[in-house]
């Protein structure tokens, strides 16, 4: 687990890889005496989402079988997405460093990349346009996953 790793859209963050099984990481985490909490969410009659919360900072959502679906980071992360976006950036900086911004599903996506997004905090999570966000709003959470299916027509 490395808080300095590059944020790779739809692929990985902090040394965890989308699509891999969480069970391949747990022995290492326990050996390092990292705090790991697990919460199970029901998603319909037969599907469950398992969330592993690591050091109260990284949240990894997995399928019932342990496949990593997405990874979110809050509070502390030093790596960057494409060497330009990072945790703690302002909305104004995102606008100035990217060509296109889209708000969907309470999240801010950039440059039509649907593998990385910033989560909009309350009360801004119901806003539809980036122009309606305060320019000095600090973005304190991001998610890496494979969200392309959300945007298919």
Model-derived regions, located:
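Short helix/turn-capping signatures at newly exposed starts of structured segments
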Residues: 1-153
């Amino acid at each position: 687990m490395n808080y300095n790793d590059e944020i790779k859209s739809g692929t990985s963050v902090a040394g965890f890889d989308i699509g891999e099984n969480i069970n391949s990481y747990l022995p290492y985490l326990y050996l390092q005496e990292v705090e790991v909490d697990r919460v199970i969410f029901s998603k319909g009659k037969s599907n469950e989402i398992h969330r592993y919360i690591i050091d109260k900072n990284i949240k990894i959502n997995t399928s019932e079988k342990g496949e990593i679906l997405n990874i979110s980071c809050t509070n502390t992360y030093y790596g960057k997405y494409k060497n330009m976006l990072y945790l703690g950036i302002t909305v104004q900086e995102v606008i100035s460093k990217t060509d296109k911004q889209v708000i969907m599903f309470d999240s801010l996506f950039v440059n039509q990349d649907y593998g990385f997004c910033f989560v909009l905090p309350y009360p801004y999570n119901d806003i539809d346009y980036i122009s309606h966000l305060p320019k000095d709003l600090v973005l304190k959470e991001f998610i890496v996953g494979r969200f392309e299916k959300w945007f298919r027509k």
